[in-house]
Swiss-Prot record:
The keyword Metal-binding applies. GO terms for molecular function: 4 iron, 4 sulfur cluster binding; iron ion binding; NADH dehydrogenase (ubiquinone) activity; NADH:ubiquinone reductase (non-electrogenic) activity; quinone binding. Transmembrane segments: none annotated. This is NADH-quinone oxidoreductase subunit B. Pfam families: Oxidored_q6. The keyword ATP-binding does not apply. Its main location: membrane. Gene3D superfamilies: 3.40.50.12280.
Length: 190
């Protein structure tokens, strides 16, 4: 007999044991909630710790295509020092979890961008940096320019500007960290 009056026959089946365990767990959690305790499941706690640790150790791979790449290099230099935020640039896509697309993406470079994105391990994030990467920019009407890298890869954060300042990219990285902590894995373009 359970405290809520439901009786479950004792049997050796796993389904019955799982049901009994779930009922007991729900009653236990409800008892703590009624007394004013903040209750969370262990798996939720582990997920939040993993998201927090993942946000503090972003390893971006640069995909510099034009003048925005110069501003991206400024953020890694001593004045802005991305290392203090746990951001370490990597040269290989297999070691990176963030791709920063900086500059004009041409039709000829689009397959290479997709190939590099596919080589990255999950979870992977993309930051689109600059007007050209966001929507074609100054060369929007050119026949050889892709009108936004989001047509090739899914983008998480858009950093506007022509070229965007190092502070803008730093703010975009901080926004990506907050997005990872919030845990919206399927939401793109925050």
């Amino acid at each position: 007999m359970f405290t809520n009056g439901a009786s479950v026959p004792l049997s050796g089946s796993k389904d019955m044991e799982n049901q009994q365990h779930q009922v007991l767990e729900q009653e236990l959690w409800q008892g703590y909630k009624d007394r004013g305790f903040v209750v969370t499941k262990f798996s939720d706690l582990v997920d939040s710790v993993v998201r927090w640790s993942r946000s503090g150790s972003l390893w971006p791979m640069t995909f510099g295509l034009a003048c925005c790449a110069v501003e991206m290099m400024h953020t890694a230099a001593s004045r802005y020092d991305l290392d203090r935020y746990g951001v370490m640039f990597r040269a290989s896509p297999r070691q990176a979890d963030v791709m920063i697309v900086a500059g004009t993406l041409t039709n000829k470079m689009a397959p290479a961008l997709r190939r590099v994105y596919d080589q990255m391990a999950e979870p992977k994030y993309v930051i689109s940096m600059g007007s050209c990467a966001n929507g074609g920019g100054y060369y929007h009407y050119s026949y050889s320019v892709v009108r936004g890298c989001d047509r090739i890869v899914p983008v998480d954060i858009y950093v506007p500007g022509c070229p965007p300042t190092a502070e803008a990219l730093l703010y975009g990285i901080l926004c990506l960290q907050q997005k990872i902590i919030r845990g919206n894995p399927g939401v793109r373009g925050a």
